[in-house]
């Protein structure tokens, strides 16, 4: 059912569930729903981990503390294996990226109509609850990683070293500078683009499949497809968060390597 109360066709149902709650227009359009849910999930991550840190004990830990410790050790192990260098920011960044993206992805397992229907009852016409299925969110996170790549590249190599890396690789000859510059610029830009679009594409496809199941099948038969897909989607949710974290660490490790 739409915001105006009319019964939607399957096509209208799908279109309605893929429409964001927005303000502004054109380039300045802001997807309010994606912003709200991403901030709330980020706050949930900070609150829960801080709560565990404050109440951490050297005795017998609780279930939540055990889970957090396992998660921290998992991320720390990946950082030690991938990142070659010393940097106190990388491990916390990796943990934040993994948990935050996982929580955003996890919203995809909530029944399609559950939160949007409740929002409609309160007068909110449109609501999408999976922030990582919004390309603006995923590309914003990837852009943040891109700026960190530039920052650490310049910090470690200096402006001259960074420019030299862009102009004298892979062909170390002045005549090849234009070709090198094009190749290295494309390589550099492709990192955040692929990082953001990979996460968006996988989560958008997953959300769309849930919506298609809900929009095209009778309510009593939806579980036949939605339950197996949800079980499989748990793997995708976790894997995409892991891939984003690992590639972030890899890119930052590469940024701090001085190729001379």
Curated annotation (Swiss-Prot):
Record-linked Gene3D superfamilies: ATP synthase, F0 complex, subunit A
GO annotation (BP), single: proton motive force-driven plasma membrane ATP synthesis
Gene Ontology CC terms: plasma membrane; proton-transporting ATP synthase complex
Alphabetical list of InterPro entries matching this protein: ATP_syn_F0_a_bact/chloroplast, ATP_synth_F0_asu, ATP_synth_F0_asu_AS, F0_ATP_A_sf
Keywords: ATP synthesis, Cell inner membrane, Cell membrane, CF(0), Hydrogen ion transport, Ion transport, Membrane, Transmembrane, Transmembrane helix, Transport
Subunit details: F-type ATPases have 2 components, CF(1) - the catalytic core - and CF(0) - the membrane proton channel. CF(1) has five subunits: alpha(3), beta(3), gamma(1), delta(1), epsilon(1). CF(0) has three main subunits: a(1), b(2) and c(9-12). The alpha and beta chains form an alternating ring which encloses part of the gamma chain. CF(1) is attached to CF(0) by a central stalk formed by the gamma and epsilon chains, while a peripheral stalk is formed by the delta and b chains.
Family of the protein in this entry: Belongs to the ATPase A chain family.
Function recorded in the entry: Key component of the proton channel; it plays a direct role in the translocation of protons across the membrane.
Protein name as it appears in the record: ATP synthase subunit a
Organism of this sequence: Aeromonas hydrophila subsp. hydrophila (strain ATCC 7966 / DSM 30187 / BCRC 13018 / CCUG 14551 / JCM 1027 / KCTC 2358 / NCIMB 9240 / NCTC 8049)
Lineage summary: Bacteria, Pseudomonadati, Pseudomonadota, Gammaproteobacteria, Aeromonadales
Gene behind this protein: atpB
